Amino acid sequence: QQHEGVLINISSGAAWKPYSGWGAYCASKAAVERLTQVIAQEEESIGLRAHSVAPGVIDTDMQALIRATSADRFPDVSRFVDLKRRNDFNSPRFVADALLDLAFDPSQRTSEVALRLPDESS
């Protein structure tokens, strides 16, 4: 019996780029990537599209916590401080709209499993 559906898991660039101090986070996002690939392969025959989406750096409370972390605990903190200074984030609204388009807009359908959202400013 053929059905149609979509599964969207939220990944992160941390799935591909290791960050000191983020071992568990990086590993869990890499696991999300692999799990989504397996689900896409296993469930394609019933019409399920599965995607893992790395939404970019989003202006959230998590980012505020990251920027408040000391450099000795998180050596890459300056990167995130610089992003804030330049206001170079994706907004939660931009990400939500992109995810809704992926799920419901037929023109946005893709067979790609791992997706990265572009920067909102581009």
Identify the function of each model-found stretch:
Residues 28:
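Active-site helix of classical SDR
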Residues 48, 52-55, 60, 71-122:
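C-terminal helical subdomain
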Residues 17-23:
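Active-site loop immediately N-terminal to the catalytic Tyr-X3-Lys motif
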Residues 12:
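Residue(s) in the substrate-gating loop at a strand-loop-helix junction
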Residues 25, 33:
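Catalytic tyrosine of NAD(P)H-dependent dehydrogenase/reductases that use a Tyr as the general acid/base
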Residues 1, 43-45, 58:
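A short hydrophobic alpha-helix cap/turn motif
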Residues 17, 38-48:
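Active-site-adjacent segment of SDR/Rossmann-fold oxidoreductases
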